[in-house]
Amino acid sequence: MIHHIPNVLTKQQVAEFRALMDTAQWVNGKVTAGTLSASVKHNQQLSEQDPLTHHLSDLVIQAIWNNPAFQTAALPHHIIPPLFNRYDEHESFGFHVDNSIRLIRGTSQQMRTDLSCTLFLSEPEEYDGGDLVIEDTYGYHEVKLPAGDLVLYPSTSLHEVSSITRGSRFASFFWVQSLVRDDTKRHLLFNLDETVRSLRIQHGDGYPEVVKLTNIYHNLIRMWSEV
């Protein structure tokens, strides 16, 4: 399932990110690409060793851990420290699939990539082209969100960033290992949690069905989670 998570960063935070990124040194994006995807990857990114990458990454991690919508949709267990990229005119990243296993930066720990995340740092009117195109069983989905918004989608999906024809597109990207690896089960849990939230608003926390459904939710987490 594809999730749009709005307002992960405020407009002020985005402006601060962009001011720092405008003075940064960018490297060829192929440095983090797998053998197959390197042939279709044409962009730039901040070096993983750049102190600015670490600083901005920490701010993104803080924002997503404090975002209830992200927590509900992703059920995160491990998060790869976010990276940052830019696409200028004529740059693109053709259809590819993300690596299934990634090394967590600065450690010897490996993690499974269940969910891929793009946090947009450019407004849609700043560039033409540059859509994130995600393929699933229902077809192709073109995603271009306001700056500060995030899209979350299964890492099993083929996806691309279409060629930029005007301007520049800045974003943060990272991966999540979920407590629940199966996308269908995560989707069911998400819908159940949203139902509980709606009932709490309508009837209050003490409503018997709220208590019963909350019990079911947590028991399903116990049944399906991997920790």
Swiss-Prot record:
InterPro entries: Oxoglu/Fe-dep_dioxygenase_dom (IPR005123), PKHD_C (IPR041097), PKHD_hydroxylase (IPR023550), Pro_4_hyd_alph (IPR006620), Pro_4_hyd_alph_FE2OG_OXY (IPR044862). The keyword Protein biosynthesis does not apply. GO terms for molecular function: 2-oxoglutarate-dependent dioxygenase activity; iron ion binding; L-ascorbic acid binding. Binds 1 Fe(2+) ion per subunit. Residues 78-178 form the Fe2OG dioxygenase domain. SMART domains: P4Hc. Its EC number is 1.14.11.-. Its cofactor is Fe(2+); L-ascorbate. Keywords: Dioxygenase, Iron, Metal-binding, Oxidoreductase, Vitamin C. It comes from the Bacteria. 2-oxoglutarate binds at R169. This is PKHD-type hydroxylase ACIAD0531.
